[in-house]
């Protein structure tokens, strides 16, 4: 998983993002790694809002600004994402290098949004107004997951739990219908347009 905060500080010296927290927010030795990472991510996002032109307050932040932040982080990614016209598109282990861009892995972005949602609520934000839980962000993450899965030749589907054989024989011999796939959203397609073309801020 990509170390977003560390990469940001190492590769963008012109933007002074502080990963150090004030003494009042210093974590005790027993604080978990998750809490430390969540604090760093929150500080990075708040600094991003302050460096925005014009600067943004947290109250005025929307899902669109969160998407801009995620695209901005792509420049610090370490995951090779092949274009559709690349000869290695869909190959999990390419035999040679290619000029396709490095991006943030879907798993990193998904975990990041989860931490930012939690931090937003811990800092007084209401869950129903959280920009990190907006529909546009959910669509974007789903599109990134699907495209990276095809591009890298990997599967992000969760493994289904094995069902006990006794339960199968005792239950009625009928198969459940497949879940209907959610139709493609035009909004999701427009949000992924910049992603496919490697646009970053």
Swiss-Prot record:
Biased amino acid composition, Low complexity: 15-32
GO cellular component: nucleus
GO molecular function: DNA binding
Pfam families per UniProt: ALOG_dom
A biological process from GO: mRNA transcription
Region (Disordered): 1-37, 151-201
Name recorded for this polypeptide: Protein LIGHT-DEPENDENT SHORT HYPOCOTYLS 2
Gene field: LSH2
